[in-house]
Each structure stands twice: as structure tokens, then as C-alpha cells.
């Protein structure tokens, strides 16, 4: 009888522990769902795009960033879409780079095409490197095109380890498209050139990447190839996204490509090179990828 009672006590205790664990998991899931809903419903009006990213491939170190997009126009206006974008990057050797920009977009062709232009100012706070850029973009559900031109504003300045560095002029062109039947992915190709200073050779190269957009986070992998003066490298980027009510559905589409409305992308971030590419004195060293 005593042994039977002990077994009952153990059984009841196990059921209680299991029940409490299940309830704790349910409470945690409900809390996270409610928290995400709160962020999307409340912060989404202020910042339709907000994200935190971690990426590798920058001098074998991890780069962290936070980025937000804030509308300056009525969020329901599809003719005059005005917004500002700000970001802060913490890169190699604790370099802090601040990016501030303003952009204007417009929806065309029954909201199936989004075109825009933007201006940006970049400032590497630690060593006072400064740069500006102008860009244009065209976005649809079947492909995208982006062109950015960068202008170094600061001259030679004393950088890390008292080495002279200079922000470079340059440009990049990017085309992208989702994989067939997978509209929640994006395959992109980017070509870039940075103009060498003081007689140094220009740096040219390209980059391919594949991004998967899940609910609440994105994962991107790619490879950057240079023309020989700088080592090629692979990179991985993980981004936590917030405040977007229109989450991409994961699945296989009935058609390879379909032209649909991109009105939900009015306030997506401007894709550009946010880190300042610099040349070291008497050499060419890319610190800004």
C-alpha cells in the first residue's frame, strides 16, 4: 500500500510539473505574440521599418546595426511618399557610423511599380570621415533596380593606429528578383567601384546574395568578389524586423512570377552601402564593407 501511494504521488507530481511547464510555454507564447502585436500596431505607425542586424564578412569581425524608417508624409498617400531613414553601425575596431537620409517615392501602374530617389549623409564618428550619396530605385514584385553614387566629403584624416585614411568616391548598381515560385526570397547581384585616391588603383568587384524573409527576421548569405587587390569573402547577415504589419507568407506560389501591388513596400529601407569605404595612406584597404 505504501509503495502504491508513493507511485501515485510521483505520478501526480509529474503531471503537475508537466502541466506547469505547458502553461509556462503557453504564457510565454501568448506574451511574445501580444508583445509583437503591440509593436506592430503602435510603433508601426511611427516606424514602418525598424530592424536590428548582425553580419559577418567585415575584416572577419561582426558588424551590428540598428535602422529605422520614419514617414514624413501621410502614410496613406501613394503619390507623394516622403520619408527619412536613420541608422547606426558598429563595425571593425568599434568604428561607429551614423547614416541620415531622406527619400521620395511614388507608386505607378496600379501600384505595381515603386520608383524613388534619395539623398544621404554618412559620418564615421570616431575618425570624422564624412560622405554623401544620391540614389535612385525601382521596385516591383518581380524585380528591383538600384543605383547609388557616393561622394567622399572629408580629406585625409588620422585613423586607427595613427594611419592616414580617406573616404572614397564610388558607385554601385544592384538588380534583384525573387526565386521562381518563392516570392519571399530575393536573389541579388551588385556591381561596385571605389575610386582610388592619390594615384592608387580603383577597386572594382561584385557581390551576389540570397535573402530569405521569414516572419520577424531575415537571413541573407552571399559572396563578395574583388578585382585582386582586396581579399574575397563570404558573409552572413541576420536581421530582426519589427513593426511591419504585412509579413511575407512562406510557401510555394502557383506561378513563377506574378506582378502584384507593392504598396506595402512604400517605406522599405533604402538599400545602399552604409559603411564608409576608405583608403589607407600608401595602400588600398577597404574598411567599409
What are these regions (language model features)?
Residues 2-24:
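Classical Sec-dependent N-terminal signal peptides that target proteins to the secretory pathway
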Residues 25-43, 153-188, 192-200, 213-220, ...:
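Flexible, glycine-rich linker and terminal segments associated
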Residues 25-95, 271-272, 278-289:
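Outer-membrane beta-barrel initiation region
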Residues 38-39, 62-77, 96-110, 132-149, ...:
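Feature captures outer-membrane beta-barrel proteins of Gram-negative bacteria and organelles
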Residues 47-56, 79-91, 113-124, 134, ...:
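Transmembrane beta-strand segments that form the barrel wall of outer-membrane beta-barrel proteins
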Residues 54-64, 88-99, 123-130, 195-204, ...:
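Solvent-exposed loop/turn segments connecting transmembrane beta-strands
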Amino acid at each position: 500500500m505504501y509503495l502504491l501511494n508513493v507511485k501515485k504521488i510521483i505520478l501526480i507530481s509529474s503531471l503537475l510539473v508537466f502541466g506547469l511547464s505547458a502553461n509556462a510555454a503557453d504564457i510565454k507564447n501568448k506574451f511574445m505574440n501580444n508583445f509583437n502585436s503591440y509593436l506592430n500596431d503602435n510603433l508601426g505607425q511611427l516606424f514602418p521599418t525598424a530592424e536590428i542586424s548582425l553580419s559577418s564578412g567585415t575584416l572577419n569581425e561582426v558588424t551590428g546595426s540598428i535602422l529605422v524608417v520614419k514617414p514624413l508624409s501621410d502614410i496613406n498617400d501613394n503619390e507623394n511618399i516622403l520619408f527619412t531613414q536613420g541608422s547606426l553601425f558598429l563595425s571593425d575596431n568599434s568604428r561607429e557610423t551614423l547614416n541620415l537620409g531622406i527619400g521620395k517615392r511614388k507608386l505607378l501602374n496600379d501600384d505595381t511599380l515603386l520608383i524613388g530617389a534619395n539623398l544621404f549623409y554618412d559620418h564615421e564618428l570616431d575618425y570624422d570621415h564624412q560622405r554623401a550619396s544620391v540614389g535612385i530605385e525601382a521596385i516591383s514584385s518581380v524585380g528591383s533596380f538600384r543605383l547609388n553614387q557616393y561622394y567622399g566629403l572629408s580629406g585625409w584624416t588620422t585613423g586607427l593606429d595613427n594611419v592616414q585614411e580617406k573616404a572614397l568616391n564610388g558607385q554601385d548598381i544592384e538588380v534583384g528578383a525573387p526565386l521562381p515560385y518563392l516570392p519571399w526570397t530575393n536573389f541579388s547581384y551588385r556591381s561596385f567601384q571605389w575610386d582610388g585616391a592619390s594615384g592608387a588603383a580603383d577597386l572594382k568587384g561584385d557581390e551576389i546574395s540570397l535573402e530569405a524573409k521569414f516572419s520577424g527576421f531575415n537571413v541573407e548569405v552571399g559572396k563578395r568578389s574583388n578585382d585582386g587587390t582586396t581579399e574575397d569573402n563570404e558573409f552572413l547577415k541576420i536581421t530582426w524586423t519589427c513593426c511591419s504589419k504585412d509579413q511575407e507568407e512562406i510557401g510555394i506560389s502557383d506561378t513563377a512570377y506574378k506582378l502584384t501591388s507593392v504598396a506595402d513596400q512604400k517605406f522599405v529601407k533604402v538599400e545602399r552601402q552604409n559603411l564608409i569605404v576608405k583608403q589607407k595612406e600608401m595602400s588600398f584597404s577597404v574598411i567599409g564593407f
